A protein has these predicted regions:
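Short, solvent-exposed turn/loop segments enriched in Gly/Ser/Thr/Pro and often Arg
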Residues: 2-10, 68-73, 127-129, 165
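Aromatic- and acidic-residue-enriched carbohydrate-binding clefts of CAZyme catalytic domains
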Residues: 8-47, 75-101
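Gly/Pro-rich turn-and-neighbor structural signature
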Residues: 50-54, 58-65, 69-141, 146-153, ...
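Flexible, acidic glycine-rich loops studded with aromatic residues
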Residues: 122-138, 143-294
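Short, compositionally stereotyped local motifs that mark structural "simplifiers"
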Residues: 251, 257-401, 420, 429
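Short, solvent-exposed loop/turn segments in extracellular or other extracytoplasmic domains
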Residues: 315-319, 460-465
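Aromatic, loop-rich ligand-recognition surfaces of beta-strand-rich domains
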Residues: 385-448, 462-508
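Solvent-exposed serine/threonine-rich low-complexity stretches and specific carbohydrate-binding patches
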Residues: 446-456
Length: 508
């Protein structure tokens, strides 16, 4: 992949005349998206891209050349005289769906596609190349979910399905991220990969033929060794293979896990590092708000007994779902027939008046950090410093606005929760927090609020406790609104919203 016209900061640092501002530019020392991109109105810059592609085609005999097209901010183009002159020269005009700069991106991609096609090759581009006009013969790699692939297939363009929320193998494969090698985020477990269907619903039989197949990706910002590549890849690559080979009606996940378990003897023989999560216990924790308890369902797919321990009591053999309604620590593991034990899985429950109560969200968390949804905020489980653990919900560009129904008039005098702050990852503390109450769930009255200074830039990633105390009040509904900051000047995210991450809302 030769990614263009964005992700070109290294090239601009070497050839500053190819950018809109002329620099100076510095090569980034971290991953991310830079506003500085190749100047689309500079003919010398276009010639540079063609020269690079020509050399790539001379070195690599592949039928396809991936030319990227993803994550191209339009900021510089909007301010650049050369880019605006090119827009005028081409007669480009924006419309309700796309800006003139979006169509300028289409001009760049179409020009490069024609150049590559003229040399007997074909191009692939990320699904952002759909924003504007799609180059005539481009193959689309659908990474921001499956919708881009659906749209491209409808347009009779070839598609490779590689949705990041299923097939990015640099995402976590376990929610116990405190015990995992650090990753970029997300949660793509093996089962999710296995059950994925690469052909979206709603396509005609003819349109389905344009779905060439799925592909998994492992990006390596957080993957420094090949040993770690193997860990992220195996056994998900086995699930990927069978997902591609099998018709939907032929899939059998439990049977596949048993066959994959037998494959571990081969992995061990070759000393391959692989993930073992699917061979340990799966613990599903679900608040049953109607009954006022947490339902804990523990399951396994390989032979062995499930053993659990509550606090310091004697170990017990698990036979049916557990109901938890008071503070405790639950530990469980699989005891295998060969005498070995699986991983010890521990959950610590701490309850408040909000625990296991109905909760609604005005704004949903970002899908990358939505996990089990609103129930994460009232399930009695608290997060640690790793915001990717599944115990945190993340909001981007919007308030957290949660309303909890206490089911009956209840006296309260305190609301508290933790924020997870990691400035480097654009996760800030709250700008403000307010608490409102209501007797009917319609008319709310504010009873407490607090503004917070932004933590300093050198703030060490940690939990940031928020606590609002107020005069006792009897109410049924409690609304908590958490307002985020925007990234400040001098931060790598300047001009963009900051994230906020919240684990458990406690009411006392």
């Amino acid at each position: 992949e030769i990614d263009l016209p964005g992700h070109q900061l290294a090239a601009l640092a070497a050839y500053p005349e190819l950018g809109c501002t002329g620099g100076p530019y510095e090569v980034w020392k971290q991953w991310g998206v830079s506003e500085d991109v190749i100047c689309a109105g500079n003919e010398k810059a276009m010639q540079f891209l063609e020269d690079v592609l020509l050399e790539v085609m001379e070195v690599f005999p592949s039928e396809y050349i991936h030319i990227g097209g993803d994550e191209v901010p339009r900021d510089r183009w909007k301010e650049c005289p050369k880019c605006q002159a090119k827009i005028k020269e081409l007669g480009i005009k924006g419309d309700q769906q796309h800006s003139a700069e979006d169509y300028l991106q289409s001009y760049v991609m179409t020009r490069m596609e024609r150049f590559v096609e003229s040399h007997g090759r074909h191009v692939i581009g990320w699904d952002e190349i759909l924003d504007g006009e799609l180059a005539p013969n481009a193959t689309v790699m659908s990474w921001r979910g499956s919708s881009g692939g659906y749209k491209a297939a409808k347009m009779h363009h070839n598609v490779i399905m590689t949705p990041n929320d299923v097939l990015y193998f640099d995402y976590y494969q376990s929610l116990d991220t405190d015990s995992e090698p650090i990753s970029i985020g997300g949660y793509n477990p093996v089962k999710k990969v296995y059950l994925y269907e690469p052909i979206p619903d709603g396509l005609t039989e003819e349109e389905q033929q344009y779905i060439l197949g799925p592909q998994a990706n492992i990006w390596t910002e957080y993957t420094s060794t090949f040993n770690l590549v193997l860990y992220r890849m195996i056994p998900r690559i086995g699930a990927l293979a069978e997902m591609q080979w099998c018709l939907p009606e032929q899939k059998d996940y439990e049977n596949w896990v048993l066959r994959e378990y037998r494959m571990t003897k081969l992995y061990d023989l070759y000393d391959w590092n692989y993930a073992k999560h699917i061979f340990d216990l799966e613990v599903k924790i679900t608040p049953v708000v109607e009954e006022g308890f947490i339902n804990v369902n523990i399951s396994k797919l390989v032979d062995g007994d499930i053993v659990y321990v509550i606090d310091d009591k004697a170990p017990l053999r698990y036979t049916e779902p557990l109901h938890i309604n008071s503070d405790c620590t639950l530990s469980c593991y699989i005891s295998r027939s060969d005498g070995t034990r699986g991983k010890l899985i521990k959950s610590e429950f701490r309850f408040s008046k909000a625990s296991m109560k109905p909760i609604t969200l005005k704004n949903q968390p970002n899908k990358q950090y939505a996990y089990d949804g609103a129930q994460v905020l009232i399930d009695g489980l608290h997060g640690h410093t790793n915001y990717r653990s599944g115990r945190w919900l993340g909001w981007y560009g919007t308030d957290l606005d949660a309303t909890i129904d206490l089911n009956e008039p209840t006296e309260i005098s305190q609301v508290k929760f933790n924020l997870n702050v990691n400035m480097k990852d654009w996760i800030f503390n709250a700008k403000s927090v307010k608490v409102l109450v209501s007797d009917d769930g319609i008319d709310f009255k504010e009873i407490a609020s607090k503004d917070y200074d932004m933590v300093p830039a050198d703030y060490i990633p940690d939990l940031y406790p928020v606590e609002l105390e107020f005069e006792p009040v009897t109410t049924r509904y409690v609304e908590v609104v958490v307002t985020p900051y925007d990234c400040p000047k001098g931060h790598t995210g300047y001009g963009y919203p900051a994230w906020i991450f919240v684990d458990e809302i406690e009411v006392y």
